Amino acid sequence: KCTGFALPGFQNAHSHAFQYAMAGLAELHPTAMKKNDFWSWRESMYALALKVQPEHIEAIAAMLYKEMLRHGYTHVAEFHYIHRDLNGSSYENKAELSERIARAAQSVGINLTIIPIYYEQGGFGLPPQKEQRRFLSSSFEDYLELNAAVKTMATKYENCEVGFGIHSMRGVALENIIELAKHRTGNTPFHIHIAEQTKEIEDCIAFTGIRPT
């Protein structure tokens, strides 16, 4: 019996679980005399992404998801883009790191939409940076294989669904964004960063002639 107000569980529609371990690492006091902006934050994020092992990703995600549940979130969409090992090589199990996320979610009891992210370039028409090596799909077909592996993995877990994801318009060739959209069926989630910074909008206009929409 409910004797007061009741609210439905919230949904976190955009999570990067491994970044929970960055708390306090990317903020600088003005007296530090160092950059303190999105780009310095990204350097900190890359540094972390190039250190975390599968067991770390699972433990960090479990800690984060426990906190989400404690604060009323019952479903999380995980925008998951670390897929490869520290050297940028594929794991024997392509879904290795996605499965670590799924195991963390099931262990704490939160519903999960896992979105393996397609990432292939370092900017509009630019090659990927070495710091991005754990994120990359080597081709469109390579990403489809990754997504298929994650879908197969997800069948082992309760309350786990899978979507398609593009990191950003700068992170994937435009023709591949369009092609991936054709693979979406029914209510399959499709997730993308439209733009993270003003510079990204400016670069998009310079490269395509239009804003990211």
What residues fall within each predicted segment?
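Active-site metal-binding motif and surrounding structural segment of the metallo-beta-lactamase
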Residues: K1-L7
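Conserved, mostly hydrophobic/aromatic
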Residues: T3, H14, G72, F79, ...
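Histidine-centered catalytic micro-motifs
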Residues: P8-Y20, P189-T198
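Short capping/connector residues at structural and topological boundaries
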Residues: Q11-N12, L50-K51, G165
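Alpha-helix initiation and N-capping motif
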Residues: S15, Q19, K35-W41, I210-T213
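Short, solvent-exposed beta-strand-terminating loops
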Residues: S15-P30, T113-G123
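Alpha-helical scaffold segments that flank or form the walls of functional sites
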Residues: G24-N111, E141-Y157
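Metal-coordinating catalytic core of metallo-dependent amide/deamination hydrolases
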Residues: R84-T213
